[in-house]
């Protein structure tokens, strides 16, 4: 490329295109094109840095899971937290109720629906045994006075159906039970005692006093202790019993 100076008698000066563009680039360093290219470069650098940090964080989480068994979950939405808090408040208020004695109720509808929630809308609780499809539904509070046991009005027929279906081998133990013949509702009462005394030893549970039975009958500490051992042994050795927890 040739260009002339101001004077008419001056010789033309040779300037290369490359030199011209280098010159203009140095003069117009903050042009729009230059700023655009710089911003693009910054974006790519930032993305690469983010990818590196994300990879390091993911590797760290995987190491935590392998090393300490930590389960990392996504953040919980506020609506779910609100529901959880309300449920915990209901649970704590129900748990803090002072109940002297519980009435065991076998509810046909609750058994059909396979109750799995605690506490329910009526203030009771549903407990799953280790035996298949056997549900004991406890509804508080009923105090046993010793004159008449309110359990006799409960629908025990549904309990018999569930009992005969899944626990028929226990009929062989009928002669080993003292004072009271072997019945499904009686087995339910023994299970209730097991759940009430789950954190105590069987000896302490037997020494708390004579266990009240239906129609004012009572069992001795020795026979009660024997019954608890028989029932607990049968629960732990049942063929279809799922592992607890």
Curated annotation (Swiss-Prot):
Protein task: Involved in spore and ascus formation. Required for the efficient assembly of the precursors of the prospore membrane to a continuous prospore membrane.
Q: What is this protein called?
A: Spore membrane assembly protein 1
Q: Name one GO cellular component term.
A: prospore membrane
Q: Name one GO biological process term.
A: ascospore-type prospore membrane formation
Q: Which UniProt keywords apply?
A: Sporulation
């Amino acid at each position: 490329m040739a260009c002339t100076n101001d004077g008419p008698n001056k010789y033309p000066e040779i300037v290369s295109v490359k030199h011209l563009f280098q010159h203009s680039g140095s003069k117009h360093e903050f042009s729009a094109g230059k700023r655009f290219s710089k911003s693009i470069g910054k974006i790519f650098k930032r993305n690469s840095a983010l990818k590196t940090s994300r990879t390091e964080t993911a590797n760290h989480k995987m190491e935590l899971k392998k090393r300490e068994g930590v389960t990392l979950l996504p953040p919980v939405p506020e609506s779910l937290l609100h529901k959880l808090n309300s449920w915990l408040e209901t649970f704590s208020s129900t748990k803090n109720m002072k109940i002297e004695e519980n009435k065991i109720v076998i509810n046909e509808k609750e058994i059909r629906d396979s109750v799995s929630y605690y506490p329910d809308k009526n203030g009771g609780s549903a407990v799953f045994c280790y035996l298949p499809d056997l549900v004991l539904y406890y509804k508080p509070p009923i105090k046993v006075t010793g004159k008449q046991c309110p359990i006799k009005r409960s629908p025990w027929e549904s309990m018999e159906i569930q009992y005969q279906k899944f626990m028929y081998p226990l009929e062989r133990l009928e002669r080993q039970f003292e004072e009271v013949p072997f019945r499904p509702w009686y087995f339910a009462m023994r299970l209730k005692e097991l759940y009430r005394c789950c954190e105590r030893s069987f000896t302490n549970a037997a020494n708390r006093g004579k266990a009240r039975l239906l129609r004012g009958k009572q069992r001795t500490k020795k026979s009660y202790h024997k019954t608890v051992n028989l029932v607990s042994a049968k629960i732990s050795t049942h063929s279809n019993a799922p592992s607890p927890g």
